[in-house]
């Protein structure tokens, strides 16, 4: 067992909750002990939903283990049906309840309720949240779509009829899923394509039964919808998209792919495409962009897309690329090979922190944890992927996909670099009389502060007793903070190799010239 203060993904039943919460007229009965009800807070506190997830917990306690927990589960299922009257019910166990092996799905089906009861077998000790969401969505689609069709191939569209598609993948607690869906919907409608079903977002079981009526499927998040889309392709002959529209180039490719599947002309939509990212990235001071070293980590979909945007549209250099989702390790390895970097496939945040510390990039694109890591290391950062915190569920419209999403990416990624330069300039000129350590105030003048202590030599003692002269230390502070650590390490390495115990201003300049060759 590995103890940790952070995990990139929760257990698979959290993924099942994301699907149930995203849908309507679905209820999830979770066989779980009293302490597993914490998951509600993910949706009400972090995502700021206005209602609790549609989940009933059996909440058995330690004393119940000596009795019949199976009867407790059946009572909870029966009560949930009578109270909420859902169109379909999901039944599963939490990671803790899995240990007592009560077979929740079988027990619920034995009640013979007049609605579909979909059992979920989610191995909590082998799989995690995204897999749980994918498996849950697949099970629901398979149970409801198969019951409404005979499995025959889809019918060809009649002449003159509008093409029809499904949008698959948006869930509760997803990174900008709400706004991505709005942006992609607008683009699909502009192509003259009718949207049959959006799932699981706001879909009902009756909606899922209509999935086979579409001509093709648009997969927005492969971590969630790829398995279901593959089954729909095998069962009903529905092709599905593979391009994720994040960034200007990928959005244009996505529109072309959707148009090809629908048999429509994409050129009018592509001609009207408006995004400020291409011009902004060409017009902005190259100091902010060109050649900036960036480290990328997140779910595979957003990480691979971010690498393409960073290199092809912003002129960054990718120095690290990784994911916590082992199910999509192949995609990350293929992308890492393109950029000539070593892929990082891990769900241990300490490994990620070590890699960031080793590479010392100028920008980190990652999850909420990479935000903390970058802050500790003094590196600019932007969040591009779940897991994320409350500030990444904004009230404003802020997609990641489509042409408007490209504008959001530019602002989100470039502004930390610009602010970093601003902080550096403030640091350089902080001794100027026009700058002060404290923010200006409209209040009356404070009492005179004591005179500052005289400057003294700051000694940084290392294993080889290195010390920094005060003038060298002051000069070091003029180096931008995001490369200051690297400059310090290189200078100390230069001094050790030459048996220099006191690093002076001359030593600092010599080291800079040595490593700048």
Curated annotation (Swiss-Prot):
Leading EC class: oxidoreductase
EC number, UniProt record: 1.3.7.7
Full protein name: Light-independent protochlorophyllide reductase subunit B
Keywords: 4Fe-4S, ATP-binding, Bacteriochlorophyll biosynthesis, Chlorophyll biosynthesis, Iron, Iron-sulfur, Metal-binding, Nucleotide-binding, Oxidoreductase, Photosynthesis
Residues binding substrate: 420-421
Role played: Component of the dark-operative protochlorophyllide reductase (DPOR) that uses Mg-ATP and reduced ferredoxin to reduce ring D of protochlorophyllide (Pchlide) to form chlorophyllide a (Chlide). This reaction is light-independent. The NB-protein (BchN-BchB) is the catalytic component of the complex.
Gene name per UniProt: bchB
Pfam families noted in UniProt: Oxidored_nitro, PCP_red
List of catalytic residues: 285
Organism, scientific name: Bradyrhizobium sp. (strain BTAi1 / ATCC BAA-1182)
């Amino acid at each position: 067992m590995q103890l940790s203060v952070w995990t990139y993904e929760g257990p698979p039943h959290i993924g099942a909750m994301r699907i149930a919460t995203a849908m309507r007229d679905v209820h999830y009965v979770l066989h779980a002990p009293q302490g597993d009800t914490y998951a509600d807070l993910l949706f009400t506190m972090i995502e700021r939903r206005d209602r609790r997830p549609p989940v009933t917990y059996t909440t058995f306690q330690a004393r119940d283990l000596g009795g019949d927990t199976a009867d407790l589960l059946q009572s909870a299922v029966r009560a949930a049906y009578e109270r909420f009257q859902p169109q379909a019910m999901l039944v599963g166990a939490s990671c803790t309840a899995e240990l007592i092996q009560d077979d929740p799905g079988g027990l619920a089906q034995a009640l013979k309720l007049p609605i579909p009861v979909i059992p979920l077998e989610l191995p909590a000790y082998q799989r995690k949240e995204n897999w749980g969401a994918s498996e849950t969505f697949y099970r629901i689609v398979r149970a409801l779509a198969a019951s409404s069709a005979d499995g025959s191939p889809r019918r060809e569209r009649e002449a003159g009829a509008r093409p029809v598609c499904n949008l698959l993948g948006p869930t509760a607690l997803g990174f900008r899923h709400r706004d991505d869906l709005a942006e992609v919907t607008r683009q699909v409608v502009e192509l003259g394509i009718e949207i049959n079903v959006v799932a699981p977002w706001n879909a009902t079981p009756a909606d899922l039964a209509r999935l086979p009526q579409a001509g093709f499927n648009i997969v927005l998040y492969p971590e969630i919808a790829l398995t279901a889309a593959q089954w729909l392709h095998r069962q009903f002959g529905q092709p599905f998209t593979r391009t994720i529209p994040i960034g200007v180039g990928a959005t244009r490719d996505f529109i072309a792919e959707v148009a090809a599947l629908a048999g429509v002309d994409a050129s009018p939509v592509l001609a009207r495409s408006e995004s400020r990212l291409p011009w902004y990235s060409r017009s902005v001071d190259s100091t902010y962009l060109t050649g900036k070293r960036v480290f990328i980590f997140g779910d595979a979909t957003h990480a691979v897309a971010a690498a393409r945007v960073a290199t092809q549209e912003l002129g960054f250099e990718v120095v690290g690329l990784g994911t916590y989702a082992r199910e999509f390790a192949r995609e990350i390895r293929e992308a890492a090979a393109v950029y000539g970097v070593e892929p990082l496939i891990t769900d241990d945040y300490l490994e990620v922190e070590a890699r960031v510390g080793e590479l010392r990039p100028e920008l980190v694109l990652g999850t909420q944890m990479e935000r903390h890591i970058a802050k500790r290391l003094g590196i600019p950062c932007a969040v591009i992927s779940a897991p994320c915190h409350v500030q990444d569920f904004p009230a404003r419209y802020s997609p990641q996909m489509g042409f408007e999403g490209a504008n959001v990416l530019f602002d989100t990624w470039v502004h930390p670099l610009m602010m970093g330069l601003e902080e550096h300039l403030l640091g350089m000129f902080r001794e100027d009389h026009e700058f002060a350590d404290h923010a200006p105030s409209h209040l009356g003048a404070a009492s005179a502060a004591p005179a500052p202590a005289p400057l003294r030599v700051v000694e940084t003692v290392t294993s080889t007793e290195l010390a920094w002269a005060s003038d060298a230390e002051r000069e070091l502070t003029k180096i931008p903070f995001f490369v200051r650590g690297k400059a310090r390490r290189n200078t100390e390495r230069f001094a050790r190799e030459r048996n220099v115990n006191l690093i002076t201003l001359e030593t600092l300049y010599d080291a800079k010239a040595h490593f700048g060759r």
